[in-house]
Amino acid sequence: MNTDNRYHWPHKDLLDVTQLSRADTLHLLDLAASFQEINSRPVKKVPTLKGKTVVLFFVENSTRTKTSFDVAGKRLSADTFALGKSGSSLNKGESLKDTALTLQAMSPDVIVMRHSSSGAARYVADLLPCGVVNGGDGWHAHPTQALLDCFSLREAWANSFEGRTLLILGDIAHSRVARSNIHLLTSLGVRIRVCAPRTLLPAGVDHWPVEVYTDLRQAVRDVDAVMCLRLQLERQQAGLLPDLAEYSRRFCLGLEHMALARPGAGVLHPGPMNRGLEISDDMADAPASLVLDQVAAGVATRMAVLYLLATRNDGGRA
């Protein structure tokens, strides 16, 4: 493990990848790579954040992100505890402000927060002196998901982003994962394509730094990787999709599609997967699938995030 003390981390919070410079991103990825080594040891724990406290404040349901942050904190020897809406006074009508101030009175070093309202994490970060990590806010942003995806792609692409092409496939309009990945990866020189039914493309997408497709076979041709997005089934109920079977026929990623991509192209998915709808069984289980690599990358990347925020005021540099 190498926590290079020459780089000054300038951010109290991690709310959106838009706040990160290219140097910030590359430093964080390098730090995550050093933490990745810990996860392969027989004893997967170091005392780096001993005495620090991390609160997992998840007002919106989460399994992967919350568990990943919990494991990340524990592997750095931080004390972690989780609080959801049902276990907080929010369920009794308390305001978000009062709940946040109550948590701050317990002197946490970092609060990781997920909320269904866009901007909620920034609101809390502006209130509190401790570090705040946005674990996902509405349709707005999911910075650590984008960072772990970036980490996974960097490993798959032998540390080279320039000249690579990524296809993001699925519900672009309602995806905070897509928004965060598009900004982060284009800042590193990756070309982005998006593919979805017109009803699942956001307004103004033609002005985004992406190529837009509605035909999967055209979109996947010669790409270096594909990122499938989870289709939220309530979109059909909202009338945005005429029929799930039709969506699957046109937009479910299969082995036949990846045969059109560049040799060695990988497939990512933030999870949970709807097999047979967004991605075929054969594709999900193929050697090209990077889904489990993403899970491992998530722990290492979130270890890096917690380390940078929890130690920022300790007098050293990260």
Swiss-Prot record:
Its EC number(s): 2.1.3.2
Pathway where it operates: Pyrimidine metabolism; UMP biosynthesis via de novo pathway; (S)-dihydroorotate from bicarbonate: step 2/3
Binding-site residues for carbamoyl phosphate, renumbered to this chain: 64-65, 114, 142, 145, 271-272
GO biological process, one term: amino acid metabolic process
Annotated catalysed reactions: carbamoyl phosphate + L-aspartate = N-carbamoyl-L-aspartate + phosphate + H(+)
Pfam families, per database record: OTCace, OTCace_N
GO molecular function: amino acid binding; aspartate carbamoyltransferase activity
Keyword annotations of the record: Pyrimidine biosynthesis, Transferase
Cellular component aspect of the GO annotation: cytosol
Binding site for L-aspartate: 92, 176, 230
Signal sequence bounds: none
Homology family: Belongs to the aspartate/ornithine carbamoyltransferase superfamily. ATCase family.
Function: Catalyzes the condensation of carbamoyl phosphate and aspartate to form carbamoyl aspartate and inorganic phosphate, the committed step in the de novo pyrimidine nucleotide biosynthesis pathway.
HAMAP family cross-referenced by the UniProt entry: Asp_carb_tr
Subunit structure: Heterododecamer (2C3:3R2) of six catalytic PyrB chains organized as two trimers (C3), and six regulatory PyrI chains organized as three dimers (R2).
Protein name: Aspartate carbamoyltransferase catalytic subunit
Gene name of this polypeptide: pyrB
